[in-house]
Amino acid sequence: STNNRLGLQKITNGSKHIDYNLFGTVTGRLTTYPRSFPILTMKKDFRRIIKPHNDWFLSLDYNGAEVRTVLALLNRPQPEEDIHNWNVVNIFNSPEYRNQDIPIDRDDAKVLFFGWLYNPESEVIKSNLYDRDAIISKYYNDDSVNTVFGRNIKVDKRRALSYIVQSTTSDLVLERAIVISKLLENTNSFVSHLVHDEVVIDLADEDRHMVPKIKEVFSNNKLDKFMVNLSAGKNFYNLEELKL
């Protein structure tokens, strides 16, 4: 469409560099400055124009990042399978919950979980496994959230849980990106960009042997070992899942 063409033209005529704003949000989630390449806001199908300097893009993100952060903050074990499927079986189809006729699938579980996480009034999760109050009492006092990364954010109690989880998840990813960047220091590969909870590596072919190590470093964060989704491709749109 004309709109798509104009949008793409605007991107290709603009800055080729990503200029992240580390202080753009109170939680620490990255934003970009107005003149930056719009990596965080561009349409997904425009990503095909983004190609690596080396041979591949390697993308890493956590499977159900914020759900896993909640479990980690409660010192609960991390399921070694897709977290939303795990929630279907262990939360939404558990005896204490099974009070509706419609079976809940993965997509439903995702919607229900985030509805519960961001709405303090929601009683949709009745399991003690996800204990909102325990997280709030540990990381919220004197009208402020205090995260494991030392962030102190003034916020009302209603939004405290979402701030704790968002900020902690964002910092987990940022901190791992820094460690991966150091790991790649004497190679041609480098951290290309971050998109929310995803770290993207510009990978040289000769560094392919490092992929399992990169995955391991990303997985083992400050809180626990999180399950990682791994994919690779020749541009930032066509990324295919890697099983490692």
Predicted regions and their residues:
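Non-catalytic nucleic-acid-binding interfaces of large nucleic-acid enzymes and RNP effectors
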Residues: S1-W56, N63, K157, S192, ...
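Helical catalytic core of nucleic-acid polymerases
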Residues: R35, T41-A160
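Catalytic palm active-site di-aspartate
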Residues: S59-D61, F113, S189-A204
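Short, flexible loop/turn elements at secondary-structure junctions
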Residues: Y62-E66, T169, D205
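Hydrophobic alpha-helix feature that most strongly marks membrane-spanning transmembrane helices
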Residues: N93, L117-Y118, I178-E185, A204
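C-terminal polymerase-core module
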Residues: P120-E123, D133-V165, D202, E206-L244
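Surface-exposed, low-hydrophobicity interaction/linker segments
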Residues: R158-R159, Y163-V179
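Active-site palm subdomain of RNA-directed nucleic acid polymerases
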Residues: L172-V195, V199
